[in-house]
UniProtKB/Swiss-Prot annotation:
Protein name: Peptidyl-tRNA hydrolase
Active-site residues from the entry: H19
Keywords annotated in UniProt: Cytoplasm, Hydrolase, RNA-binding, tRNA-binding
Record-listed E.C. numbers: 3.1.1.29
Assigned protein family: Belongs to the PTH family.
Top-level EC class as recorded in UniProt: hydrolase
């Protein structure tokens, strides 16, 4: 079983923000259909299941994402976990893959690492660094030029995640799917 968790913040006001690219990728994957919604209360998030694939959108707000992942991990005990999140240190449109490592200052990743460790794969989607404060920038919406490109980036990431689920080799996926801005 594989758990794919997209990080973001709940609520309409955050729906199209840079910090929610993880949620956006889960929504892109859900469009393929065939997923059943699983009771969300005990998992502190929206959980969807299709065969041996679980998709998760934590409802804990970004900085407490680990609570939701831990609940799902403890119940389902997936063989593999893939976390999708925004990355300020990568230019917009860049996509990188890694296993484990440091949180890079991302509080959602810190929360996950603190509760389940860091032995999981990560899909890092670059959002760049704006001129505003970090909080204003990550909670801001994409500009029009970025919105058009974002659709392609999300489609690219979806293909990478599906292949990662199939092959299980983050190094192979990184070689094939790393995207530069």
């Amino acid at each position: 079983m594989t758990l794919v968790a997209g990080l973001g913040n709940i609520g309409k006001e955050y729906e199209n923000t840079r910090h929610n690219v993880g949620f956006m990728l889960i929504d892109t994957m859900l469009k393929d259909g065939g997923f059943n919604s699983v009771s969300s209360g005990k998992f502190q998030g929206e959980l969807f299941k299709k065969g041996s694939l679980l998709l998760l959108k934590p409802s804990t707000f970004m900085n407490l994402s680990g609570n939701s992942l831990k609940a799902v991990n403890d119940f389902y005990k997936p063989d593999n976990i893939i976390v999708i999140h925004d990355d300020l240190d990568l230019p917009f449109g860049t996509v990188r893959f890694k296993r484990g490592g440091s949180s890079g200052g991302h509080n959602g990743i810190k929360s996950i690492d603190n509760l389940i460790g860091n032995d999981y794969d990560r899909v890092r989607i670059g959002i760049g660094r704006g001129n505003n404060s970090v909080i204003s920038y990550v909670l801001g919406e994409f500009i029009d030029d970025e919105k058009d490109r974002l659709k392609d980036v999300l489609a690219h990431c979806k293909n990478a995640v599906l292949e990662l689920i199939s092959c299980g080799d983050i190094t192979q996926i990184s070689s094939k799917f790393t995207l530069k801005a």
